[in-house]
Amino acid sequence: MPRFGAHMSISGGVSKSFARGESVGLDSMQIFAKNERQWTAKPISPEEATAFRTEQQRTGIHPVVVHDSYLINLAAPADELREKSIAAFADELERCAQLDIPYLVTHPGAHTGIGEEAGLARVADAICRLLAEGVGGNTMILLETTAGQGTALGYRFEHLARLFELIPYHERLGICVDTCHIFAAGYDIRDPEGYQTTFAELDRLVGLTRVKCFHLNDSQKDLGSRVDRHAHIGQGCIGVEAFRMLVNDPRFADLPMIIETPKGEDMAEDRMNLALLRSLVQGAE
């Protein structure tokens, strides 16, 4: 069975995320390693890192996945923004290494007008620069599929394939597939034929063994809208059958499948979405 998870708050410190995750019954979890809307943050103290490991051992929640800051744009043509982005991304990698977190999820960035190929080249150059220096230890960077809003890169599987061509550090590079994003980008996974076609295409271009994580989100917007709006599982334009196929796909049997669906402070919606996903697993009681 996949390891079902959700994005949890780190309010009060990164270690506090585990108790929240435990309260909604998570197997795996996604967090921010710092405030996602600020460029810099105070370092994680050794005490906080120890508390994080202790809480992870206590709850058994694994793997933990970090999503990087929304401010980071490794494709940015403006040198000042790009250098700030690279420095911030390096900090994210080092925070992951400090907490023994295996995966850092990032959107490939937005080219803001310089063109897709030039944007992808800048992303690759930035990542190569950091990985050549060994930044982040063994933490793997997961390139996330995007909906393709504005000039965002990563909405075509060809973009991801190009980044794998340009970045030789494949042992530290993987993919995170977001169901809402690929659907908004035009990949129809609602029926068996479309589902198989989509993942055959991803396998041909990138390789399914490089998929290390899923973001399971339904979509408020229709197929090919290029608009990123998440919905509760089965309550959007994708519908429940795509998720039934995903959670029973033996190729993805042990992967973290993390919801990023709308929720309030009591996280009741997380419990609802996770219960639905678990009920779709064949043989689940």
From Swiss-Prot:
Keywords from UniProt, A to Z, are: DNA damage, DNA repair, Endonuclease, Hydrolase, Metal-binding, Nuclease, Zinc
Q: Which residues bind Zn(2+) 1?
A: H67, H107, E144
Q: What is its EC number?
A: 3.1.21.2
Which one of the record's GO molecular function terms can you name?
A: deoxyribonuclease IV (phage-T4-induced) activity
Cofactor(s) needed by this chain: Zn(2+)
Give me the residues that bind Zn(2+) 3, please: H181, D228, H230
Q: How is the cofactor bound?
A: Binds 3 Zn(2+) ions.
Q: InterPro entries from the entry? A: AP_endonuc_2, AP_endonuc_F2_Zn_BS, Xyl_isomerase-like_sf, Xyl_isomerase-like_TIM-brl
**Chain positions recorded as Zn(2+) 2 binding sites:** E144, D178, H215, E260
Q: Which SMART domains match?
A: AP2Ec
Q: What GO terms describe the biological role, i.e. biological process, of this protein?
A: base-excision repair
The reaction(s) annotated as catalysed by this protein in its Swiss-Prot or TrEMBL entry are: Endonucleolytic cleavage to 5'-phosphooligonucleotide end-products
PROSITE patterns per UniProt: AP_NUCLEASE_F2_1 (PS00729), AP_NUCLEASE_F2_2 (PS00730), AP_NUCLEASE_F2_3 (PS00731), AP_NUCLEASE_F2_4 (PS51432)
List the SUPFAM superfamilies.
Xylose isomerase-like (SSF51658)
Q: What's this protein's function?
A: Endonuclease IV plays a role in DNA repair. It cleaves phosphodiester bonds at apurinic or apyrimidinic (AP) sites, generating a 3'-hydroxyl group and a 5'-terminal sugar phosphate.
Q: Which family does it belong to?
A: Belongs to the AP endonuclease 2 family.
Recorded hits in HAMAP family, A to Z, give:
Nfo
Recorded hits in PANTHER family, A to Z, give: APURINIC-APYRIMIDINIC ENDONUCLEASE (PTHR21445:SF0), ENDONUCLEASE IV ENDODEOXYRIBONUCLEASE IV (PTHR21445)
Name assigned to this protein: Probable endonuclease 4
